[in-house]
C-alpha cells in the first residue's frame, strides 16, 4: 500500500460522507488510483480501525476514530466517556460515537475480579452487568475512578 493511497484514503474518510465501500472505491479511482476494489477497501478499513457512525446529517458513514490504538487503563479514555450512570441492575456508559466497543473491550479485560460479569456495546452506549457479589454502587465508583485516572 503506497503512502499516497493511504493519505488519500484517510482524507476521504475524514470527509465523513462515504456510506459504502463502493463509494470509497469510486472516489479513489476518480483520484487516479488503479487496482482499487472492494476487498482492498475492506482490508484498509480494518487496518485503520474505521467505523461506521452517523455524521452531522445523520447519515451512516465510514470514519476514522480519534484513538487508533487498542485501549488500556493508561490510555486517555476520559475524553471518550461522556457519562456513567446506573439503575439497580445495570451500569450504562455513554461514549462518543464509535467508541463504545473499544471501552467495552477494556472493561471485559478487567473482568470478574473487579466485579464486571460482562458488557454489551452498541455504537455509543455500553451496558455493564455486575457480578452478583459486588454491590452496584461500588462497581459504579470503580468504573468512574478508572476513567478519571486515565488522563
Swiss-Prot record:
Pfam family, one: Arg_repressor_C
Keywords: Amino-acid biosynthesis, Arginine biosynthesis, Cytoplasm, DNA-binding, Repressor, Transcription, Transcription regulation
Biological processes per GO annotation: L-arginine biosynthetic process; protein complex oligomerization; regulation of arginine biosynthetic process; regulation of arginine metabolic process
Pathway(s) this gene product operates in, as recorded in its UniProt entry: Amino-acid biosynthesis; L-arginine biosynthesis [regulation]
Compartment(s): Cytoplasm
Entry's Gene Ontology cellular component terms: cytoplasm; transcription regulator complex
Database matches in InterPro entries: Arg_repress, Arg_repress_C, Arg_repress_C_sf, Arg_repress_DNA-bd, WH-like_DNA-bd_sf, WH_DNA-bd_sf
Principal localisation: cytoplasm
Subunit structure comment from the entry: Homohexamer.
Its biological purpose: Regulates arginine biosynthesis genes.
Name of the protein in its database record: Arginine repressor
Originating species: Haemophilus influenzae (strain ATCC 51907 / DSM 11121 / KW20 / Rd)
Gene: argR
Amino acid at each position: 500500500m503506497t503512502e499516497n493511497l493511504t493519505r488519500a484514503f484517510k482524507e476521504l474518510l475524514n470527509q465523513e460522507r462515504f456510506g459504502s465501500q463502493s463509494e470509497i472505491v469510486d472516489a479513489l479511482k476518480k483520484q487516479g488510483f488503479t487496482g482499487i476494489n472492494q476487498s482492498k477497501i475492506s482490508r484498509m478499513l480494518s487496518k485503520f480501525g474505521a467505523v461506521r457512525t452517523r455524521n452531522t446529517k445523520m447519515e451512516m458513514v465510514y470514519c476514522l476514530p480519534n484513538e487508533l490504538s487498542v485501549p488500556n487503563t493508561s490510555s486517555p479514555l476520559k475524553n471518550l466517556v461522556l457519562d456513567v450512570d446506573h439503575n439497580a441492575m445495570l451500569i450504562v456508559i455513554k461514549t462518543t460515537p464509535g467508541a463504545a466497543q473499544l471501552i467495552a473491550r477494556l472493561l471485559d479485560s478487567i473482568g470478574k475480579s473487579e466485579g464486571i460479569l460482562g458488557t454489551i456495546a452498541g455504537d455509543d452506549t455500553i451496558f455493564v452487568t455486575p457480578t452478583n457479589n459486588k454491590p452496584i454502587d461500588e462497581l459504579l465508583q470503580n468504573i468512574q475512578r478508572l476513567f478519571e485516572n486515565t488522563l
